[in-house]
Amino acid sequence: MPTRGLLYYITDRTAFADDEPTRRRRLLEKIAEAARAGVDYIQLREKDLPVRDLESLAQEAITLLNQLRTGHKSLPTALLINHRTDVALATGADGVHLRADDISPQEVSTIWKKCGAGTPARELSPRRPVIAVSCHSVAEVTQAASQAATFAVFAPVFEKKDSANSKPAGLAALCEACKADIPILALGGITLSNAHSCLEAGAAGIAAIRLFQENNIAEIVRALR
């Protein structure tokens, strides 16, 4: 990549062809692998889980990351919870990943502050939450920017092999989205061969599920940086 792009690993434990306990173990191993490799953000995106199971998995992931941070103070990885601000707060996650039709980033920040998250007593949490927003149009990107989101994830940029009904936006649309006053991460069909073109179009980084989860993450990070 021409510059050091941000890297965002989005989890999907259902891609592992195992029983549920093994899936959870393998996912936690991938989360640790991503953190050690220097991935900037990890989104726990296990939408099928009941809230109690999601909380349990999130707590395991956060405990794991905190253990890694103890030995590596410069560990950059932040854990975001998909959609569930309540779970993010309850477990001490670093932030939340919102859909475009979720509550606004401003509301999340207000709730976060009222709950006392990120105070010195919880020094492993940020003083302000990391708030990512999924966007599928320039209008949604503009809205995310106006509501003080940390960054927007623009998708799908390229065709995804498992989403025949999802029309890719393409690099031209990504370039237009990147004109907004907010960092943009490109998602959707990202590979090692096309990731460079996303940064050249103005993206601040890339987000992916398969690219990270189905490969050696350390090797992927080295190839991208």
Tell me what each language-model feature is.
Residues 1-105, 109-114, 128-151, 166-169, ...:
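Conserved N-terminal beta1-alpha1 strand-loop-helix module at the mouth
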Residues 204-208:
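Acidic, Mg2+-coordinating phosphoryl-transfer loop and its flanking beta/alpha structural elements
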Residues 117-118:
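Glycine-biased, low-complexity coil/linker segments
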Residues 161:
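Conserved beta-loop-beta/alpha segment of the NTase-like Rossmann-fold superfamily
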Residues 155:
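Flexible, gly/ser-rich surface segments that form the specificity/activation loops bordering the active-site cleft
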